[in-house]
């Protein structure tokens, strides 16, 4: 009996034009997803590969039932989308689940207006080994030998 040759083909994280199906094109929508944060399904989470940090807005912090004593000190001021200085309330580490993968994330908690509940930035994307595409409205990452994806919601982003 001849031996089978085992060929290992590396999985590639890529996006094709066919994957735009189901999205409204052309668009300039933010990538807005639902993630499980701290054990709760949280909607209106923006994925921003330009953000150097994960941000949680105070409204979400309160909805999750977290208290001021749950925060650790975070004293570096941030700059808002409008260019204003925002002093964080503090920082908190919470689990964020994507599919079956769980990543501990340090959120900077801020009291500022936002149409989003949280912003997931580069640290989360990198720890998950993920690649995002606002054009395709998806986040892709490798898990258990397969490519998994989180699909954004254009209707929520608008």
Q: Which functions belong to the PLM regions below?
A:
Residues 1-158:
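Short linear "hotspot" motifs
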């Amino acid at each position: 009996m001849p031996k089978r040759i085992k060929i290992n083909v590396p999985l590639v994280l890529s996006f094709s034009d066919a994957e735009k199906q189901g999205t409204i094109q052309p668009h300039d929508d933010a990538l807005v997803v639902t993630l499980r944060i701290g054990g709760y399904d949280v909607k209106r989470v923006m994925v921003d590969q330009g953000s150097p940090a994960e941000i949680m807005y105070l409204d979400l912090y309160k909805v999750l039932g977290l208290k001021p004593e749950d925060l650790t000190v975070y004293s570096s001021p941030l700059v808002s989308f409008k260019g204003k200085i925002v002093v964080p309330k503090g920082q908190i580490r919470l689990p964020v689940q994507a599919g079956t993968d769980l990543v501990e994330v340090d959120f900077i908690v801020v009291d500022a207006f936002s149409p989003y509940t949280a912003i997931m930035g580069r640290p989360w994307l990198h720890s998950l080994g993920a690649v995002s595409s606002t054009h395709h409205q998806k986040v892709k990452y490798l898990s258990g030998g397969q490519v998994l994806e989180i699909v954004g919601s254009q209707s929520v982003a608008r």
